[in-house]
């Protein structure tokens, strides 16, 4: 379970869930709740991209 690709998929899925929750939150899009969820989503998606890049770097160094 230490594979960076698996963790990248998990972080990306959680980021998508946070994005969905922020988009479907009651009230306006500029409420504290929706902004907080979007911050969490951006963080998770950025971590997923870092995990995918790290996996590519590991595979490149193994050759």
UniProtKB/Swiss-Prot annotation:
Disulfide bond residue pairs: none
Keyword annotations of the record: Cell membrane, Lipoprotein, Membrane, Palmitate, Signal, Transmembrane, Transmembrane helix
A Pfam family of this chain: DUF4305
Subcellular location field: Cell membrane
GO cellular component, one term: plasma membrane
Transmembrane intervals: 34-56
Record's signal peptide: 1-15
Membrane topology: Lipid-anchor
Lipidation, S-diacylglycerol cysteine type: 16
Lipid anchor positions (N-palmitoyl cysteine): 16
Protein name as annotated: Uncharacterized lipoprotein YdiK
Organism placement in taxonomy: Bacteria, Bacillati, Bacillota, Bacilli, Bacillales
